[in-house]
Each structure stands twice: as structure tokens, then as C-alpha cells.
UniProtKB/Swiss-Prot annotation:
Keyword flag Lyase: no
One of the record's GO cellular component terms: ciliary membrane
Coarse class of the protein's main subcellular location: membrane
Source organism of the structure: Danio rerio (Zebrafish)
Name recorded for this polypeptide: BBSome complex member BBS2
Keyword terms, alphabetized: Cell membrane, Cell projection, Cilium, Cytoplasm, Cytoskeleton, Membrane
Pfam families found in the cross-reference section: BBS2_CtH, BBS2_GAE, BBS2_hp, BBS2_Mid, BBS2_N, BBS2_pf
Compartments it resides in: Cell projection, Cilium membrane; Cytoplasm; Cytoplasm, Cytoskeleton, Microtubule organizing center, Centrosome, Centriolar satellite
Function, in words: The BBSome complex is thought to function as a coat complex required for sorting of specific membrane proteins to the primary cilia.
InterPro entries: Bardet-Biedl_syndrome_2_prot (IPR016616), BBS2_CtH_dom (IPR055381), BBS2_GAE_dom (IPR029333), BBS2_hp_dom (IPR055380), BBS2_Mid (IPR029429), BBS2_N (IPR029430), BBS2_pf_dom (IPR055379), WD40/YVTN_repeat-like_dom_sf (IPR015943)
Signal peptide range: none
Subunit structure: Part of BBSome complex.
Length: 715
């Protein structure tokens, strides 16, 4: 059994997912974590001499080994690592919703302090692609930004939604790091510098990512799912009723391969095999886990796995010795495994007994057939998918029709599908009087992604008490919520995107048949669909010159179609021209609002500064009156002071609301740049994103819309 080699009780609470280890003097590892009241604590048990107090750094009154770094803002992320080329020790990086601080703990100095308008929800430090110097990369409000050791902004791009997790990993095995980004739109995106390489769709917000080895990485979702990918292939995943607070890769059983270490919200720590997800080690804290890191904390040349809880408990574990032979569990956990295996054996014995009873019933079919669930040998489970428009009683949906070709009935159906049903599964259990050989299940995909439907059906006779289980998998195409039956009165879409391909029309037809739910194979690439989810039309047309025009008012749909078609036809670089009048009009209004909110923000900041000066003067006058015994004037000044203070609080509320509204508008602007990029592929996409950002920086709104339409700055 593996036990902690050290346990510490720190007198400071720890914010979840904000734990790091840094060698700030280049030698001694120090546990660093965000704590309450906008502070970061640095635990350094190695140099116990009194440490100097600086403008940000102060000694903790509760623990002599802890120094407190005052950020004066709510900390949203932190990390530590080598940033400067000449620095001997690690740099501490602390992100908030408005700023990024790079701090040299050893010299008590700011390396740089940058304002970040999009906030910093996640941070990672390291080398990216061909960029020579290490970057502090932050993910915020739909944007990614990378700073070097001087605070220069060397990297910027946009992503689909608010960023929640980041990790650097050699995803393409070319010897250079790619950036993996987990966001609130449930996607894991892979960036080769500012170029999007690929994306994997999950079914919840991606809260944590960690590099394991090679192109393999672990991930955690907000719904309690953890798992492992190797590139775009998912090896395994498990789901828990608790939330994964932190994941980390560490070789705990000393077999040369790292395991996925997960810290959970109920205080549990577990280590799972990267190949199978099998649990090889468990331990428990009395409170939620805050973070999992690694370091040579005892300075004895051995790396320990260090786990922390939100209450400030710290435990260190050494990898298992050879004598343990990989047996890291305690005896009680082994007993749990024996109980689980016994239960599984009992279930299998029961299933075997059912088969034996069915076999005994075969000679006398007339008597036992109905009860024992014996069915004809030619019984098959048939499935069909069809598009159903909205009616008075039901929303528009995809109808899954499950049927048998003979007199047998379907007693129950279980469907497992990611991201469609709550809890990822759906059970249909018709009442006894409604039993038949056909079950219809309405399916409403929330967005345009391909979904595998894993179907299990219980099939038997009308009076059976035992049933045969049929299993079948059916894929729902990506663009299944689009119907060929079009309302003639529907208005023509005003938005469009146009691009050229060098491929046969038959290949486009193949793509249509593979990605849309069509009643029968079509042989023309010129089609019109009705969008069931958002309304409106989608027209796809192909000229003999190879020019494709997609007409829709939904810019997101246009981007999805361009990316899907380019992937199917293996197009690496694709330039496109687009025009979405309705969306561009909304964006222009949003940009005007951004300017207005910026102006209001500056006025409110100036007003608050004036009020602060008034309060300072009023306080001095009130204290003078008190010392002179002038109670009448003192009372008058304190009443005025109370009124000023109340005004200041009200102004702060207005400023806070203004700031939140500004953030929402900035998110819309970043998403607009992302959408304009998704209408192109490869280098043209990167060029559009960069050019759009430059246009916004220079406040050149007309150039911004020209770039979004034409895809180039020269047009």
C-alpha cells in the first residue's frame, strides 16, 4: 500500500485549480497557491531565515514558512516556470480578470504587469511552435494571448468561446509544441501557433487538460468526466457524480509510463492507467482537492507527487518501490474489488441460467415459447432515421424508428448518445397495452455534430417474461437537422460565402449524402434545405467552374459547412469571400457600444478618483473638528462623508455593470473574428484573424468589415 511520505497543514485556504510549484531561486521548490482576499501564498520550508518584505510580498503572521503576495484582485489562474532567457530561477505568473502579473519572487520585483482586456481564465508557460522565447499564454474571453519575458505580445488568436483550460503538447509529433485549448463550447481545439489544426467535440465544458506523453493527453469535463486522448482518438473515459478539480500526469507505480492522477471535489485522489482507465491507487482528503503538482519537495533527488486540499492540507507521495510490484491499493480496496467481481459472477450465473431454461423450453415450443422469450431465427433489429418538422404538439426533431420484421415485440429500448440526452442515455419503456414491434424515439441534437447512437432493444414474444437483447450502432450525420422539404413562402437568405474548389461535383454530392440526412441519395450538388433548429433556408450551389456558393443567414452554419467540406475534400488552404448583411449590421452596432462603454468607463474612473480626493479631505476636516472639540462641525463632516461613501458605492455598482456589459460586447467582437476565420481554411484563415485584430487595434472599422468580406487586407 502506498502512503504519504509527508503531510503538511498550512493555515491558508487554497483556491481550486490554482496551485503550482516554482524554483524561484533556481534551487528550492516552493509550493505556490492562490488563497483568499486576492493573495497568493508561497510556501518555502527550505530557507527559514526572515525574508524581506517588499511592495507586494509580506510575511504570513500564521506561518513562518509562508510569504504572501498581495495581488489586490481576485486571482483567476497562476503558474510558475522559466520565462526569461537569462533568469536563474522561475518566474511566478498570476492572472486576474483584468491583468497579468509576471513576478520575480527571489528579487521581489515585477517582471511585467500587463492589462488584459479579455481576462485570464487559464494560463500555461512554455515554448510554442517556432516562436523562440518561452511564452506566458493566457486564455480569456474567446481570446488567446502570449507574452514573452519583456511583456511583448508575440501571440494572439481567437477561439470559439471562453477558455477554461490550456496545455502545451507535441500533438503532431513534429518536435514542436502545439497549444491545446479547452473551452465553454465543449470543444478541445489544437493550435499550431495561430493556425487551428483540429478540434474534438465533447459534451460539457472542458475544465482541465494535462499532457501525458507524446501526443497523448488527459482531459476533464464539468460534468465529472475524465479521460485520455491520443491525438483525436479517445482511449477511454469515465464519469463520476463528483467533479474533477485537478488532473496531472505522474508515474506512480514506477513502470515507466505516466498515470492520470485525478483530484475530486469529494476529496478523493485516484491514479488511473493511461491505457485502460483502470484505478491503480486511491486516497482520500477530508475536503475537496485543490490541485495536484509534482516536485522534489524534500530536496533528496526524488520527485514526489504533491496533492493539496482546499483547506490547506498537503500530502507528498513517492513512486512505488520495486518490492510493492505495482500493488498500491490497501487491503480494504482489494476487498471492494473482490466484492465487485463476486457480484459480476452472480450476474453472469443468472444470465447462464436463463439461457439453460430457454434451451429446455425448445422441445416444447407450443407450451413454453411465450414465457421463455424464444423468438424466430430471422428476427433482426431494423433502424431508420427521418427528419420531422415541428407540429403543434412537438418540436422539430429527428425520428429514430426501431422495428422488427415479424410478430415479435420490443419491450424496452436503451439509447446511449453523447451530448443529446441528459445523463447521456435515454430509456423508452412502452406500457403493456402499447407494446408493438415498432418504437419511435424523437431526437433533438443541440448543435451540428455527428453523434453515435448505441441502441439496445429487448425483443421477445407478446407475453414473454424473458427477452433477447439486440445491440446496434447508428450514426447521426453532422447536419441532420436540415430538411429538403422547403416552405415556398420562406424568405431568401441574404448572407452568403463563395469559394472555389478543384474537385469533381460527384465528390461534393458524396459529402452531402454523408453529412445530411437525405431520404434517398441525391445526384446533384445544387440543393436547398430548411433549417429546423433556427429557421431560415440553406442553399448550396456549384458552378461548372468549381465555384461553390453557400447561402444562409447563419454565419456559424456557413463556417461549419466550409470546415466540414474542406476536411472531406482534404483542402489545406481555402480563400473565401463572404457577406452577411444582417450579422455585420449587428456587429457594427456592437462596436459602437464598445466605444460608448469605454467612454463611460473612463468618465466613471475619473469621477471615482475625484470622490476619493473629497473623502480624503473630508476625513481630515472631520478629525480636525473632533480634536478641537467642534462637535457640530464634526457631525456635519461625518454626515457628508457618509453621503459621499454611499455615492462611491453606487458609482462602483454602475462601473461594475458597465464593465460586465463591456466584457460581453468584447466577447461578441472576438467571436465575430473567430467566425470570419472559420469561413476560410489554413493560411487565409490565420491572415484574416491577424488582419481583423490589427484593424480593431487601429480602430479602423471599415477595414475590419472589408477584411471579413474579402478575406484579405488588399481588397
Amino acid at each position: 500500500m502506498l502512503v504519504p511520505i509527508f503531510t503538511l497543514k498550512l493555515n491558508h485556504k487554497i483556491n481550486p485549480r490554482m496551485v503550482a510549484i516554482g524554483k524561484y531561486d533556481g534551487i528550492h521548490p516552493c509550493l505556490t497557491a492562490a488563497t483568499q482576499a486576492g493573495k497568493v501564498f508561497i510556501h518555502n520550508p527550505h530557507t527559514r531565515a526572515q525574508r524581506p518584505t517588499a511592495h507586494r510580498l509580506s510575511q504570513s503572521t500564521q506561518d513562518s514558512d509562508i510569504s504572501l503576495l498581495n495581488i489586490n484582485q481576485s486571482v483567476s489562474c497562476l503558474t510558475a516556470g522559466t520565462l526569461g532567457p537569462k533568469s536563474t530561477g522561475d518566474t511566478l505568473l498570476v492572472g486576474s480578470q483584468t491583468n497579468l502579473l509576471a513576478y520575480d519572487v527571489h528579487d521581489n520585483t515585477d517582471v511585467f504587469y500587463k492589462e488584459v482586456t479579455d481576462g485570464a481564465n487559464a494560463i500555461v508557460l512554455g515554448k510554442l511552435g517556432d516562436i523562440q522565447s518561452p511564452l506566458a499564454i493566457i486564455g480569456g474571453n474567446c481570446a488567446l494571448q502570449g507574452f514573452d519575458y519583456e511583456g511583448n505580445d508575440l501571440f494572439w488568436t481567437v477561439t470559439g468561446d471562453n477558455v477554461r483550460s490550456l496545455v502545451l503538447c507535441d500533438f503532431t509529433a513534429d518536435g514542436k509544441n502545439e497549444l491545446l485549448v479547452g473551452s465553454e463550447d465543449f470543444d478541445i481545439r489544437v493550435f499550431k501557433e495561430d493556425e487551428l489544426v483540429t478540434e474534438m467535440a465533447e459534451n460539457e465544458t472542458v475544465t482541465s487538460l494535462c499532457h501525458m506523453h507524446g501526443s497523448r493527453f488527459g482531459y476533464a469535463l464539468a460534468n465529472g468526466t475524465v479521460g485520455v486522448y491520443d491525438r483525436t482518438a479517445r482511449y477511454w473515459r469515465i464519469k463520476s457524480k463528483n467533479h474533477a478539480m485537478s488532473i496531472h500526469a505522474f508515474d506512480l507505480n514506477a513502470d515507466g509510463v505516466v498515470e492520470l492522477i485525478t483530484g475530486w471535489s469529494n476529496g478523493k485522489i485516484d491514479a488511473r492507467s493511461d491505457r485502460t482507465g483502470e484505478v491503480i491507487f486511491k486516497d482520500n482528503f477530508s475536503s475537496s482537492v485543490a490541485g495536484v503538482v509534482e516536485g522534489d519537495y524534500r530536496m533528496d533527488g526524488q520527485i514526489q507527487l504533491i496533492c493539496t486540499s482546499v483547506e490547506g492540507e498537503v500530502r507528498g507521495y513517492l513512486p512505488a518501490s520495486k518490492e510493492m510490484k505495482g500493488n498500491l491499493m490497501d487491503s480494504s480496496i482489494e476487498q471492494d474489488l473482490i466484492r465487485e467481481l463476486s457480484q459480476r459472477k452472480q450476474n453472469l450465473m443468472l444470465e447462464l441460467r436463463n439461457y439453460e431454461e430457454n434451451a429446455k423450453a425448445l422441445p416444447g415450443l407450443s407450451e413454453g415459447e411465450s414465457k421463455m422469450g424464444v423468438i424466430p431465427a430471422n428476427t433482426q433489429l431494423q433502424t431508420a432515421l427521418s427528419v420531422r418538422r415541428a407540429s403543434e404538439s412537438q418540436k422539430a426533431h429527428i425520428e429514430l424508428n426501431i422495428s422488427t420484421p415479424n410478430e415479435t415485440i420490443i419491450r424496452a429500448v436503451l439509447i446511449f448518445a453523447e451530448g443529446i440526452f441528459e445523463g447521456e442515455s435515454h430509456v423508452v419503456h412502452p406500457s403493456a397495452q402499447n407494446l408493438s414491434g415498432c418504437v419511435r424515439v424523437p431526437i433533438i441534437p443541440p448543435k451540428d455534430i455527428p453523434v453515435d447512437l448505441h441502441i439496445k432493444a429487448f425483443v421477445g414474444g407478446k407475453t414473454s417474461t424473458q427477452f433477447h437483447v439486440f445491440e446496434i450502432t447508428r450514426q447521426l450525420p453532422r447536419f441532420s437537422m436540415y430538411d429538403l422539404n422547403v416552405d415556398p413562402s420562406a424568405p431568401e437568405p441574404t448572407g452568403k460565402v463563395t469559394f472555389c474548389i478543384n474537385d469533381r461535383p460527384q465528390r461534393v454530392v458524396m459529402w452531402l449524402n454523408q453529412n445530411f440526412l437525405l431520404p434517398e441519395g441525391i445526384d446533384s450538388p445544387d440543393v436547398t434545405f430548411s433549417a429546423l433548429r433556427g429557421g431560415g433556408l440553406l442553399r448550396i450551389s456549384l458552378q461548372t467552374s468549381g465555384e461553390i456558393t453557400l447561402r444562409t443567414d447563419d454565419i456559424d452554419l456557413a463556417g461549419d459547412l466550409v470546415q466540414s467540406l474542406a476536411s472531406f475534400l482534404a483542402i489545406e488552404d481555402l480563400q473565401a469571400e463572404s457577406d452577411f448583411p444582417v450579422y455585420f449590421k449587428e456587429l457594427r452596432a456592437t462596436l459602437t457600444e464598445v466605444d460608448e462603454f469605454h467612454s463611460v468607463h473612463q468618465k466613471l474612473t475619473a469621477a471615482m478618483a475625484d470622490h476619493s480626493n473629497y473623502i480624503r479631505n473630508m476625513l481630515v476636516q472631520a478629525e480636525d473638528a473632533r480634536l478641537m472639540g467642534d462637535w457640530r462641525n464634526m457631525k456635519k463632516r461625518y454626515i457628508e462623508l457618509y453621503d459621499l461613501n454611499r455615492d462611491l458605492v453606487n458609482e462602483y455598482k454602475i462601473r461594475s455593470n458597465n464593465h460586465n456589459a463591456l466584457l460581453a460586447r468584447l466577447k461578441s467582437v472576438n467571436q465575430a473574428i473567430q467566425r470570419a476565420g472559420r469561413l476560410r481554411v489554413g493560411k487565409p484563415k490565420s491572415q484574416v484573424i491577424t488582419a481583423c485584430r490589427d484593424a480593431i487595434k487601429n480602430n479602423n472599422i471599415n477595414a475590419l468589415f472589408k477584411i471579413m468580406r474579402a478575406g484579405t487586407t488588399s481588397s
